[in-house]
């Protein structure tokens, strides 16, 4: 296996938590939207930044940014009540990739502070770049621009892989020329991931290792 840049999503890829949906639910109710409606929207837009979720509810950009700020504040508080839990194979998978010489990067819709807190909680210090989302920078093209600025070669994407649970992760990878796009499907329906450009779909995180080793 050649040394690769491996870009990971965070929530529902490396870790899981009830705090994210709980925070969205509280903000939804404050806006007069039912938790059930918000849950359906989150199912339809997995992995999207909070700002985009609130835009999809019909809010104007300024109101959506304010709602996203409220969401992040609630998420910070709820994290202590509803702790983030790593998937059982997350640590060993990251360790294996580090041993193979991979450059690990994190691109998440969560805030930079929460991303850093989760990595510290789990003792995951192998990530060379940790990109969160806030009012200035959202997960998406802006994160790829930051990765390009940090990469040691201009053709870094040709030696990259992206790992995530949402169609958006796959779409972003395809749009930016990442050849290996691995979707994590733990629900048994990979159609949305494949339609969005996933080159591989796995059900557990450790299943990415044979794919990356053979590439």
Regions found by a protein language model. Name each.
Residues 1, 99-102, 150-158, 215:
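Glycine-rich phosphate-binding loop signature in dinucleotide/nucleotide-binding domains
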Residues 1-41:
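Active-site neighborhood of HAD-like aspartate-dependent phosphohydrolases
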Residues 5, 140-170:
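Conserved Lys-Pro-Asp/Glu-containing loop-to-beta segment of HAD-superfamily phosphomonoesterases
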Residues 24-30, 48-62, 118, 147:
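Helix-loop "lid/cap" segments that line or gate small-molecule binding pockets
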Residues 38-43, 124-139:
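A short, structured active-site edge motif that brings together acidic residues
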Residues 76-106, 112-116, 141-142:
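Short, acidic loop-to-helix structural element flanking the phosphoryl-transfer center
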Residues 131, 200-207:
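Short acidic-hydrophobic, aromatic-tinged amphipathic segments that line or gate anion-handling sites
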Residues 159-202:
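Acidic, Mg2+-coordinating phosphoryl-transfer loop and its flanking beta/alpha structural elements
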């Amino acid at each position: 296996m050649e040394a690769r840049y491996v870009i990971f999503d965070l929530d529902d890829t490396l870790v899981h938590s009830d705090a994210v949906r709980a925070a969205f639910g509280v903000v939804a109710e404050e806006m007069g939207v039912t938790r059930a409606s918000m849950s359906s929207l989150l199912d339809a837009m997995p992995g999207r930044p909070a700002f985009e979720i609130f835009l999809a509810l019909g809010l104007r950009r300024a109101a959506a940014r304010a709602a996203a700020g409220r969401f992040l504040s609630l998420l910070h508080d709820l994290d202590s009540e509803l702790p983030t839990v790593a998937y059982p194979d997350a640590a060993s998978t990251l360790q294996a990739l580090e041993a193979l010489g991979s450059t690990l990067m994190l691109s998440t819709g969560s805030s930079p502070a929460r991303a850093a807190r989760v990595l510290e909680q789990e003792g995951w210090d192998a990530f060379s770049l940790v990109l969160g989302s806030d009012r200035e920078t959202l997960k998406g093209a802006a994160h790829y621009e930051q990765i390009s600025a940090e990469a040691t070669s201009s053709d870094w994407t040709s030696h990259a892989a992206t790992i995530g649970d949402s169609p958006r992760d796959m779409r972003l990878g395809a749009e930016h020329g990442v050849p290996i796009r691995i979707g994590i499907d733990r629900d048994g329906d990979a159609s949305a991931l494949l339609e969005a450009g996933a080159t591989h779909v796995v059900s557990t995180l450790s299943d990415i290792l044979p794919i990356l080793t053979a590439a």
